[in-house]
């Protein structure tokens, strides 16, 4: 069975999904990025299934190589953007933790505001 056209089309779809994920990450549309991940994983599984059935010819591999490079480049860029986002979230969680500690330490003052006063002697 010649599945070369179907395999090539599957790779094109994977490239499109990869480019979509990169665009979403670049635009910081994190919810949409996560939602698109399953379609990407399914596309990868489809390609794996197709290549298990019949190994692509050397010619087909040469045609697919630029697509694979693009997909890997996009994936690397998405990972970098995700790492930046994770660092931002870690910083926010750290700030929130500090605020919680401050509120815990100073929030139980019985409703009194503690402030320095001038000595009136």
UniProtKB/Swiss-Prot annotation:
Top-rank taxon, per record: Bacteria
One Pfam family matching this protein: FliT
Keywords, ordered alphabetically: Bacterial flagellum biogenesis, Chaperone, Cytoplasm, Repressor, Transcription, Transcription regulation
GO CC aspect terms: cytosol
Main localisation: cytoplasm
Subcellular locations according to the entry: Cytoplasm, Cytosol
Record keyword Repeat present: no
One BP term from GO: bacterial-type flagellum organization
Region feature Required for homodimerization, mapped onto this chain: 1-50
Region ranges (FliD binding): 60-98
Gene3D superfamilies xrefs: Flagellar protein flit
UniProt xrefs under InterPro entries: FliT
Function: Dual-function protein that regulates the transcription of class 2 flagellar operons and that also acts as an export chaperone for the filament-capping protein FliD. As a transcriptional regulator, acts as an anti-FlhDC factor; it directly binds FlhC, thus inhibiting the binding of the FlhC/FlhD complex to class 2 promoters, resulting in decreased expression of class 2 flagellar operons. As a chaperone, effects FliD transition to the membrane by preventing its premature polymerization, and by directing it to the export apparatus.
Family: Belongs to the FliT family.
UniProt subunit comment: Homodimer. Interacts with FliD and FlhC.
HAMAP family: FliT (MF_01180)
Protein name per the record: Flagellar protein FliT
Native source species: Escherichia coli O9:H4 (strain HS)
Gene name, Swiss-Prot/TrEMBL: fliT
